[in-house]
Regions:
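Sec-dependent N-terminal signal peptides of Gram-positive bacterial secreted proteins and lipoproteins
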Residues: 4-26
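Acidic, metal/ion-coordinating pockets
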Residues: 25-300
């Protein structure tokens, strides 16, 4: 009888142990930081090698942070023969492999004409945003003006803004009809109001933070209509928390600009051609930006590297094609 009781006790203890182990397995604690990290780039201009490092950095940070995103300030599909040969397709496929949360349009996204841009948009996993481009006579923008992305229980709105000088700097005939009359506009004279309306709309939709992906910059050709440069845009609007800028290839790690409402706005830009990768950390309403020298980051992503090898091989084969000959020595 005594042995039977001991056996029963042992069985009960073993059963309790199994339940305890199972419970431990089911309640694994995620000790990663709740801070939000946004990696950003601008004006890459087809320097495709940087995408592998960007993807690797995203994955590495995701080991420490629960919420890691990637965004672009535009001018990614133009800048080298890789872009020209594929009419931007190689670049879009690379960006899909990295996985972007939001992208805007630079002036050079229109270089292959609007019809081709529409084809590329259909290939994109993340559709571009641009609040200030529309057909004349239409109230709605041609592309979605902003996108809302959830990071845990925090909603961030990204608003896309493209330089109004695109109308004259990127295949200008595509923006006019056969009679030379304008049929599209980037709204140079009402830009501040358009941007402000979208800030207000995003906040009404529940955005806790609002970030601009602006392709404006400080370039000499940025003066068009009421706009002088990115700082005048910030000073004439109210509600941005962070502005990630592009177009002038400026290197700005962090600059504080006071907006129309008297609030500090963080301004940053990564230069061009993946010279830097930007890192924005959001922690309880605080915003910190830093620039990481891409050449000093050594990790790469295997999947992106594999595709880079593929497109380089295709590019090499295309370069061997005979397109003509000359009888002149």
């Amino acid at each position: 009888m005594k042995n039977k009781i001991i056996s029963i006790i042992i069985c009960i203890l073993m059963f309790i142990g199994v339940i305890s182990i199972s419970a431990c397995n089911l309640t694994t604690v995620d000790n990663r930081s709740d801070n939000i990290v946004i990696l950003y780039e601008n004006d890459v201009h087809c320097v495709v090698e940087g995408y592998s490092k960007l993807s690797a950095m995203k994955k590495e940070l995701n080991e420490t942070y629960k919420h890691v995103g990637v965004v672009s300030g535009g001018d990614y599909i133009q800048g080298s023969s890789l872009g020209v040969i594929s009419q931007g397709e190689y670049i879009i496929k690379l960006m899909n492999l990295v996985g972007y949360d939001a992208v805007t349009l630079g002036n050079h996204e229109f270089d292959y004409r609007l019809e081709r841009l529409e084809e590329l948009v259909n290939m994109m996993d993340t559709k571009p945003i641009c609040c200030n481009f529309n057909a004349i006579g239409e109230d709605e923008p041609y592309f979605e003006p902003y996108s809302m992305v959830s990071y845990g229980n925090v909603d961030i709105a990204y608003i896309g803004i493209t330089t109004p000088t695109t109308i004259s700097s990127s295949s200008p005939t595509q923006f006019r009809d056969e009679n030379g009359e304008p049929i599209y506009t980037f709204n140079p004279n009402t830009l501040y109001d358009i941007v402000q309306n979208n800030i207000d709309s995003a906040k009404s939709a529940g955005a806790e933070y609002v970030i601009a992906l602006s392709h404006i910059g400080y370039a000499d050709d940025a003066i068009y209509g009421e706009l002088e440069d990115i700082e005048t845009l910030i000073k004439n609007t109210d509600g941005f928390d962070v502005v990630l800028d592009a177009h002038s290839h400026s290197v700005i790690e962090e600059k504080l600009i006071i907006d129309e409402g008297g609030n500090e706005v963080v301004l940053s830009s990564t230069g061009t051609k993946f010279e830097y990768i930007g890192k924005l950390v959001i922690s309880d309403g605080e915003f910190d930006t830093q620039l990481i020298k891409t050449s000093e980051y050594q990790k790469t992503d295997t999947a992106v590297d594999t595709y880079l090898e593929q497109i380089n091989s295709e590019y090499s084969e295309l370069g061997k094609r005979k397109v003509g000959y000359s009888e002149v020595d």
